[in-house]
Amino acid sequence: MKTKIQCPAKINLTLKVAGKRDDGFHNIESIMQTISLYDYLTISANAAEKFDIKLSGNSTEIPYNEKNLVYKAAMLFIEHTNLPPHKIEIYIDKNIPVAAGLAGGSTDAAGTLYGLNKIFNEPLSLTELHKLCAKLGSDLNFCLEGGRQMTKGRGEVLEKLPFEKMNISLIKPKKDRKSVV
């Protein structure tokens, strides 16, 4: 079983950071927008004696091990489904710049959940996928659906907004910056 998933980058058109939550995160209100810059995942799954996850890709800037959010997403999917063991291989064709604030890792993790769900004939509902997304990060719920949406809470509350075409230019400085909300 094999599938290829297109994972779009996203930008924040607006961002309002509100009070701190009991869980240590901040409440946000943000209009997020997917853009036409993509990573691509090639996901394959074959029956095996035990579950095994292997990551590979074209970038030297990301880890291909358990520290990668894609790996964590695959593990979370396995833990929340009652599937027989498989060897899961995920190739990450990285085009979204790393550490650019464009949700490259988040969109790849959301794409992993979506792709595995597709390969295994949708054992999880969209609501269940969103619950897994929320466990992995604040912008994964948006990345699962994309488009233009108002996000609230920690990023788990989504409201679709009308889309108006716009042209943008993105500039990434040479020095990486980690985005933290």
Kindly give the residue locations of the regions a language model identified.
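Short coil/turn segments at secondary-structure boundaries
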Residues: E61-N65, P97, A103-G104
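ATP-dependent small-molecule kinase catalytic core of the GHMP/sugar-kinase superfamily
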Residues: K2-Q6, T14-S30, E122-V181
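N-terminal beta-alpha supersecondary unit
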Residues: K2-H86
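Short pre-catalytic strand/loop immediately N-terminal to key active-site residues, enriched for Gly-Thr
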Residues: E29, I88-G101
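Phosphate-handling active-site elements
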Residues: I78-E89, G115-L136
